Amino acid sequence: SGSCSLKTCWLQLADFRKVGDALKEKYDSAAAMKLNSRGKLVQVNSRFNAPTIHDLVYIDPSPDYCVRNESTGSLGTQGRLCNKTSEGMDGCELMCCGRGYDQFKTVQRERCHCKF
C-alpha cells in the first residue's frame, strides 16, 4: 500500500467590515458617466482620470439619503439617534447632513439579573 498527500485550498471571504469599507470607498470615488450620441459611455468630467475596470461608474446620481423618499424607500435621517463623538457613519455631523442636531442626556436603568 502506498501513501499520498493531499492539499486542500479553502476560499474564505474577507471580514464583512473590510468588504463594506472597500465598497464604500469605491462608491465615494465612483465616476460620473453619460451616454454620448453614439450610445457609448463617456466621462462627465474629463479632468479626472478615466475609470479603470476596477472602478465603479454611474449614470444616474444617488438619491439624497438625508431626505425621506418614498419612491426609493429611503426613510431619511431626520429623527435618528447619532453619536456626537463619532466621526463615522453614526456620527452626528455626517448623519444629520449638516442640518444640526439636538443634544440630550439620558439615564437608563436596567435589571442585570445579577446573582451574588
Curated annotation (Swiss-Prot):
InterPro entries named among the record's database cross-references: Wnt, Wnt_C
One Gene Ontology molecular-function label: frizzled binding
Disulfide bonds listed in the record: C82-C97
UniProt entry keywords in alphabetical sequence: Developmental protein, Disulfide bond, Extracellular matrix, Glycoprotein, Lipoprotein, Secreted, Wnt signaling pathway
GO biological process: canonical Wnt signaling pathway; cell fate commitment; neuron differentiation
Glycosylation sites: N69, N83
Family, similarity comment: Belongs to the Wnt family.
Protein name in the entry: Protein Wnt-5a
Gene: WNT5A
